[in-house]
Amino acid sequence: MILYAVLGAFAAFLLYMDVLYPFVIYPLRARWHKCGYIPRDLSWPLGIPLTLVVLSKLRKDMLLQFMAAQDLSRPYKTSLRQFLGKWVIATRDPENIKAVLSTKFNDFSLKERGNRMRHVIGDGIFTQDGAPWKHSRDMLRPQFTKDQISRVELLSHHIDVLIREIRKSGGNVELQRLFHLMTMDTATHFLFGESVGSLEVSGESKGIEITDPKTGEIVNTVDFVESYTFANKFALKKIILNDLEFLADLTEPSYKWHLRRVHTVMDHYVQLALKATEKYDPDDDSEKGEYYFSHELAKLTRDPLSLRDQLFNILIAGRDTTAATLSYAFHYLTKNPAIYAKVREDVLTVFPNGDASLATYEDLRKAKYLQMVIKEVLRLAPAVPLNTRAAVRDTYLPRGGGPAGNLPVFVPKGTAVNYPTYILHRDPDIYGADAYEFNPERWRPENKLPNSPMYSWGYIPFNGGPRICIGQQFALTEIALTMIKLVLEFERLEPADDFEPNLQDKSSLTVMVGGSGVRVKLS
């Protein structure tokens, strides 16, 4: 009897989720709210087939290409689809994305995505909603003034270390790994006032060495980078598993140990910041010395947990995204030697003596063709390729419903709206027939078109609206300076013998070049 009851309950649940909701309940509620019919991408039962395909493609580093091929082959840009039993709305329509991120901003939140990331990276600006998020934004935004984001001298030292490492290897290197080490160093230097020195770790030197006060374990730079990388992947796994996120905890029992190692390092710098600012007097001009991000935050809050969480959030955003953009830039430039030569020519017009050691923030903006290349890299490889929000109340998107797709789309409270930036940036309706091609020329001012992404929400590498990335100018400064110093140092960029020109785009919390990375020869 119990078995029959269980089977009956499951059959009723299946009937509701796979038939009644998509074909009866949702359409009736949409009509009540004066919204139109929306296409349905069916994957019976409970979206399980789609879920299994997504997990399979993710393991093979083929998820982004698979999703783009699927979505761009459909005649519509907004649809209702099922994933792990839940019905979600997916859209690549710029007007709908604008509504989610800007015009109807208060109708949406991070919801489960924020909660799941919070279990890993803490309660900070990238995991918060509502009043806590506004408080964090107001606290953090002043730290990204032009004076701070244009600290070229801070970045320049670490880029010089990168160049030294490339020279040591004879110019035959895998750049993606080096870029991730360099951006870890620049990010920690900016945040903590000193770098963890991951690029300089070699032989007997293990970089920083910090003792966990609870366990006595010594955590060095190698340990920190390893555990930080694990935390990144673990957070993504929890997001993908959705309501089954507990499976991530069960299948990765070492996650607590990895997080403890990361926290050991973060807590060390938090305590240094608290100690350095314990007698802070805002009216005492003599205290205004060298800028440290952690010290400035410690002047605003004395809560060590809050400080750690905010610093962890900023580190995640500032390190991996910049490394991803630099990696893709050199991947595409390796495949396009004529464009590399043109970038070098452009940079030499700004720095005719071949020396950018005294470059200023304003100098970086003068390399116009380089800026076009960076824009194109961010189009094809947006650092955060997939994103989502959830409706906090019954609301609607401006279009996508009805036979012609020009009626509003009903979004019930609690429903997730997925907007894949990676696919949006490849839409031929926005970028033309060559949307998949690496073509910096499309960004020339004279090439502006009525449907140009410069005038729409078809180009959002840093998101948009109130939650637009507050550190984007710092990231663009680091990307531009790194590329300038590398092209000035190395006249030639060639593929290494094991360079893979047609790599898959790998999705972690950020996008990464898959396969063996970016294997090149620089000379």
From Swiss-Prot:
GO terms for molecular function: heme binding; iron ion binding; long-chain fatty acid omega-hydroxylase activity. It catalyses: an omega-methyl-long-chain fatty acid + reduced [NADPH--hemoprotein reductase] + O2 = an omega-hydroxy-long-chain fatty acid + oxidized [NADPH--hemoprotein reductase] + H2O + H(+); (9Z,12Z)-octadecadienoate + reduced [NADPH--hemoprotein reductase] + O2 = 18-hydroxy-(9Z,12Z)-octadecadienoate + oxidized [NADPH--hemoprotein reductase] + H2O + H(+); (9Z)-octadecenoate + reduced [NADPH--hemoprotein reductase] + O2 = 18-hydroxy-(9Z)-octadecenoate + oxidized [NADPH--hemoprotein reductase] + H2O + H(+); hexadecanoate + reduced [NADPH--hemoprotein reductase] + O2 = 16-hydroxyhexadecanoate + oxidized [NADPH--hemoprotein reductase] + H2O + H(+). SUPFAM superfamilies: Cytochrome P450. This is Cytochrome P450 52-N1. It is an enzyme of class 1 (oxidoreductase). InterPro entries: Cyt_P450, Cyt_P450_CS, Cyt_P450_E_CYP52_ascomycetes, Cyt_P450_E_CYP52_fungi, Cyt_P450_E_grp-II, Cyt_P450_sf. Disulfide bonds: none annotated. It is a single-pass membrane protein. Heme binds at residue 469. Keywords: Heme, Iron, Membrane, Metal-binding, Monooxygenase, Oxidoreductase, Transmembrane, Transmembrane helix. It is found in: Membrane. It comes from Starmerella bombicola (Yeast). GO terms for cellular component: membrane. Catalyzes the terminal (at the omega-position) hydroxylation of a fatty acid. Probably involved in alkane metabolism. Its cofactor is heme. It comes from the Eukaryota. Its main location: membrane. Induction: Up-regulated when grown on alkanes as sole carbon source. PANTHER family: P450, PUTATIVE (EUROFUNG)-RELATED. The keyword Cytoplasm does not apply. The keyword Magnesium does not apply. Belongs to the cytochrome P450 family. Its EC number is 1.14.14.80. The chain crosses the membrane at residues 5-25.
